[in-house]
Amino acid sequence: MSGNLRILAAVSATAALILLGPAVALADTDGITVHCVNMTSLDPRFSSCDDQHPTIQDAVNDAEAEESVLVGAGTYPEQVTVVRPLLLEGAGTASTTIKPGIVTSNTSSLFSGAPIAAIVLVNGTTGVAVTDLTVDGSAAASTFACSPGYVGIFYRASSGAIEDTHVTNVFHPLAPGCQTVLGIFVQSGNGGPGLNSNVAILNNVVDFYGKNGITANEPGTFVTVTSNMVTGRGATGLGDAAQNGVQIGFGARGLVSGNTISAHDYTPPDFVACGLLFFRAGGGLGRAKGNTFVANEQDICTAGVGPSSNSPFN
């Protein structure tokens, strides 16, 4: 089965349209299209494996464009960088976990150049699907403070889909007020050739994050945020972050629909925690529909002029 067909089989029709786009399928050069990691015969996908790898990054490095990396059950203590179109699929959020014990800066903000440590980095490519796994930042969270920024899944000038994943514990317990700690981040650096990002974020659980659950920033970024459960840390106060569940900001555009967004609250009222924050976004309230908001200080916030003291780094 070709890489395109595997991606179509793994993600929803909405996401597949984004993944495939106008690209022409690339020819396989080595006869290996399905790269497996720690896969055993107990996994129903085992018969489709063309090879086996000890780590996710090893399999990703070996995969050609539009091929598949299927990850077996287990906990993988690594950061992963993807730079070509492929499917990265786990055995389910309860079975496959990417949980590094330590993270280092592996990229930077396209806008400011600030260093970022991403657990899963999708950098400068299209057609990348991440599905059926957990990204857990807890083990590395106490090993550094507010710099570099800390991100669970970062689509940096990249397009594709994140579906049926759990992004959790991207949070600094010893420095909870850090503003650069995000569950999922999609960025385009003000757009331009090779910089646009178009990502479908579908049916995920994003929880226990530092600042924002899902963030999309800058012109050239479009996100479809649908059927996710985004849960903040509840009441936070002085020295902590005023959290936002979903942020569409700085010229980014997005459709936010059918999500459950809860537990964002900040005291004192100098700053506001928002379930959904549109900050100088390319689209307004018309781009949000059918969401369920529970226990947020403010369910939907909009800001259109000047800097906001309640927005993460850009």
Task: Map each language-model feature to its residues.
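Extracellular beta-strand/beta-solenoid scaffold signature
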Residues: 102-121, 143-154, 175-193, 208-217, ...
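Right-handed parallel beta-helix/beta-solenoid
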Residues: 24-58, 62, 73, 91
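Extracellular beta-strand-rich solenoid/capping regions of secreted or surface-exposed proteins
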Residues: 57, 61-65, 76-89, 97-132, ...
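Bacterial N-terminal signal peptides
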Residues: 10-21
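Bacterial N-terminal signal peptides that target proteins for export
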Residues: 1-11
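Parallel beta-helix/beta-solenoid
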Residues: 64, 83-84, 93, 124-125, ...
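Extracellular beta-strand scaffolds
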Residues: 76-78, 88, 94-95, 127, ...
